[in-house]
A protein has these predicted regions:
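Hydrophobic packing within well-folded, soluble alpha/beta domains
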Residues: 11-14, 65, 73, 145, ...
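Polybasic "coupling" helices that flank or enter modular domains
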Residues: 82-148
Length: 184
């Protein structure tokens, strides 16, 4: 989609698909900020103050994205108060999610972080099987989960193995089925 040092000229609206939004640390590691889902936007911070995006957005599944020119959007906002309120609502929702994620990662152990992420995936990216179990539709590697919760792939493997032994979930390279979402 775009790199963090690229000049921001568009507000991106994700119609369908998934985007990983991240910053690159000094040691070239990716620090994942969030996973964008259908209907979410990115680039709103540039509406008021033009500049670089400040992060990288990368498609991790087939995606359809609507691009809105920021200069045209600024004019619409200037002329339409209710539209402005809607954009503010998007920004406030994103801020609240970021604060929750930051607090979760700051004060919780590895297993709790992984559970928090899996709960989010069950809520947004799963389907209910006839058995009542939840299958996460989005294929994820343990490294991807680790990136999302700021832990190593090895730590994710240990957590998933432990949860599988406790009959909370079953996983392999192609599927992740949650038997007991209430225990996440």
């Amino acid at each position: 989609m775009f790199e963090e040092d690229e000049e921001g000229t568009f507000l991106h609206v994700l119609i369908t698909g998934r985007l990983k939004v991240f910053k690159t640390a000094d040691d070239e590691r990716q620090v994942v900020l969030y996973l964008m889902r259908d209907g979410e936007t990115i680039g709103e911070h540039l509406i008021d103050k033009p500049g670089a995006y400040g992060y990288t957005a990368e498609s991790i599944s087939d995606s359809v994205i609507l691009l809105l020119r920021l200069d045209a959007l600024r004019e619409i906002i200037r002329q339409n108060l209710s539209f402005c309120r809607g954009v503010n609502g998007l920004i406030f929702t994103r801020l609240q999610k970021a604060e929750n994620r930051m607090l979760n990662y700051r004060f919780n152990r590895t297993e709790e972080r992984v559970c928090f992420f899996l709960k989010e995936m069950v809520e947004h990216d799963s389907r209910k099987l006839v058995t009542g179990e939840r299958e996460i539709k989005f294929l994820m590697t343990q490294a991807f989960i680790g990136d999302m919760v700021s832990v190593s792939r090895q730590q994710v493997t240990l957590v998933l193995r432990n949860m599988a032994q406790r009959k909370i979930l079953k996983y392999n390279r192609r599927r992740l089925v949650i038997f007991r979402p209430d225990l996440l």
